[in-house]
Every structure is written in C-alpha cells, then in structure tokens.
Amino acid sequence: MSLALIAERYESDVDQLPQTHSELGGGAARAASGLVYENLIERTCEELALDARKNDYKRTEEVNGACLKNLQVDKHIYRNSVMVKAVESKCYLDSCYLKRAVMDFIELEQSPEVPEWVEYAIFAGQNACGNDAFVYYKAFFKKMTGKEVKIFFVNPSRKRSSSRSIYNEQYREDFKLDSVVYNEFVEWLKK
C-alpha cells in the first residue's frame, strides 16, 4: 500500500467514526478514534519496511533491587530487528498524556533493553495541552535524556476543542490529515 493510499485509508477510517458513535456509543467511538492514529502509524511503518510492535514489553532499570518488566509505549519501531524509535499515539494530546508519555520515554531511555540510539516521538491529531506544560515536559525530557522528543500534530485544527469531536460529522474538516506534517513524520521514521 503506498503512502497516498495509507492517507486515504486514514480519511476513510475517520469517516466511519460518526457511524461507530451513533451505533455503539461514545466509549466505542473514543476507542476507535485512538485506533485511527495507531493504524496510520502501523501502516506507514509497514510501507517503509519497519516493524511497529505493540505490547513489546521492556524491563526498567533496577532501582533498590526492584525492576518492572512491563514498560512500553504504543509502538516500538524496529528496523532490521533493532529498535530505532518509540512512538506514543493520541487522538489528542493533553498535559496528562504528555506527562505520561515523557515519563515512559525516560524509563525506556534508561532501560538496559533499549538501545541508546532510539528516538522518541508523540504522534497526535490535536493539541489539548497548555503551553506551560507543553514547554516544560519537552524541556524535562531533554534534561533527563539529552534528547529531543518530537511531537507531530497531524490534523489542520491543531488545537483541540472538546465540543468539536472527531466523531461528529459537522467537524470532519478539523480531522483531515495534514500532508505536510504527515510527510515530516515519514521522513523522521526513515532516519
């Protein structure tokens, strides 16, 4: 499937969300809207000959003799069986999701099972995060790891409004795929 067809599939998946909402309710529509972005990442990786893994659990570093074995984000991306990227996916990114993603990325960065060259990104439709939290958590990640966390907002209405949901047909244009940002994400994956 070409990248153009993958983008068309994204649009088709978003077009189905109002029906999901009317037939199955808000919870099902919210779950389906999250999958729209995860599926876009997965299909894009497939096209680029990358392996986007879900439930690819890693071990945390040991602290005072304790260690967790369930560390993961939405997609651990492999090239030639070697982990190269970690991506958290959100329909919209609020400060709670940003904080959690940054903390998970820091733990991944410190994991003995994650190569030191792994890069980190958040792939989201819209931004629901206040500016202070947005600036702080990006800076905190840099302070703790020495690395940048990339954040891609792929919908043209980058600022979220809770009254303009993705599964409301009236606001469909807010959720078109921004091809410029999507292509930036593709180029980042290729690096």
What are the language-model segments listed below?
Residues 1-54, 63:
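Interdomain/boundary linker segments immediately adjacent to catalytic/signaling cores
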Residues 33-41, 68, 94-98, 178:
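Phosphate/oxyanion-binding active-site loops and adjacent basic polyanion-contact surfaces
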Residues 41-49, 105-112, 141, 189:
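Hydrophobic, Leu/Ile/Phe/Ala-enriched alpha-helical segments that form helix-helix packing faces
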Residues 46-53, 78-83, 111-115:
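Secondary-structure boundary elements
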Residues 54-74:
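Long amphipathic alpha-helical segments with strong coiled-coil/leucine-zipper propensity
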Residues 68-86:
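Active-site beta-strand-loop-beta-strand hairpin of nuclease catalytic cores
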Residues 82-85, 89-144:
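Catalytic cores of nucleic-acid endonucleases
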Residues 110, 122-191:
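Domain-level recognition of nuclease-like catalytic cores that cleave nucleotide substrates
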